[in-house]
Amino acid sequence: TMKTLKPSVKIYGVMPVGSAVYVESRRQGQLVTLDHCSSMADAVVRKTGEEYLYPYIEKYVDDIFTVTEDSIRQAVRTACLYGKLTLEGSGALALAALLEKKCPLSPGTVLICSGGNIDKAVLDLCMQA
């Protein structure tokens, strides 16, 4: 992992406010189940986090930020208009965190924006934002 190769590397995660199972799990010190969850970032919507994944998050992820649905839509729109990228909601989470000024930026900062499986109606909604 990057942390093994260079322990000073900071790794951050981003989750939608409406489905922040790993944020709540970290807060409670154990994997939890949410009562309700929803987000346009449907690839990361989980009531319960993945049991196999949680220990890796605890070990390697320095912090997890949450972003709003408005920011996710704005990130999809920004990527499309200025980056010529079509991103689904989940793929736009890192950019949404940057737009909300939640990501600490320094030289060498990398944002991973991956995933373009977005419904045309959802993309149209984002483009109207």
Regions found by a protein language model. Give the residues of each.
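PLP-dependent amino-acid enzyme catalytic core
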Residues: 1-129
